[in-house]
């Protein structure tokens, strides 16, 4: 899958879209096919190394996403494949797929677009 990967801190234009492995699910997680990812001010600072939180390299930024659940992990009961959701990912959201704990999900109303949800 493709993801926006940060291998070093610096301006946005030094970072690249790369092929990475699809995330594996842990118990309590779902796999989301990302349709939209939010870009917040902290995200811009994080990739430049200007935020108090500095993740280890390489990392995939993206703390908020909207998309559809494509896979359900063990122990997840409140969601199903195909559900439209909003998730607070912490990181990893700027990818085609992201694994997140179901406890971070909210159902996205049909009246909202994925872009509005992210």
Tell me what each language-model feature is:
Residues 5-7, 48, 69:
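Residue-level signal for short segments within beta-strands and strand-turn junctions
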Residues 6-14:
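Extracellular beta-rich ligand/substrate-recognition surface
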Residues 11, 38-40:
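Serine-hydrolase catalytic-loop signature spanning alpha/beta hydrolases and amidase-signature enzymes
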Residues 21-38, 50-92, 99:
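Glycine-rich beta-strand-centered segment in the early N-terminal region that forms part
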Residues 98-112:
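Short, compositionally biased
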Residues 112-118:
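A glycine-rich, Thr/Ser-enriched phosphate-binding loop motif common to dinucleotide/cofactor-binding enzymes
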């Amino acid at each position: 899958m493709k993801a926006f990967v940060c291998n070093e801190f610096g301006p946005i234009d030094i970072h690249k879209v790369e092929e990475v492995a699809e995330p594996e699910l842990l118990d309590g997680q779902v796999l989301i096919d990302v349709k939209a990812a939010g870009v917040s001010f902290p995200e811009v600072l994080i990739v430049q190394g200007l935020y108090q939180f500095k993740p280890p390299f390489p990392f995939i930024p993206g703390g908020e996403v909207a998309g559809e659940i494509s896979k359900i992990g063990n122990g997840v009961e409140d969601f199903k494949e195909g559900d439209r959701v909003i998730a607070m990912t912490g990181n990893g959201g700027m990818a085609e797929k992201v694994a997140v704990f179901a406890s971070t999900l909210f159902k996205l109303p049909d009246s909202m677009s994925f872009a509005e949800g992210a």
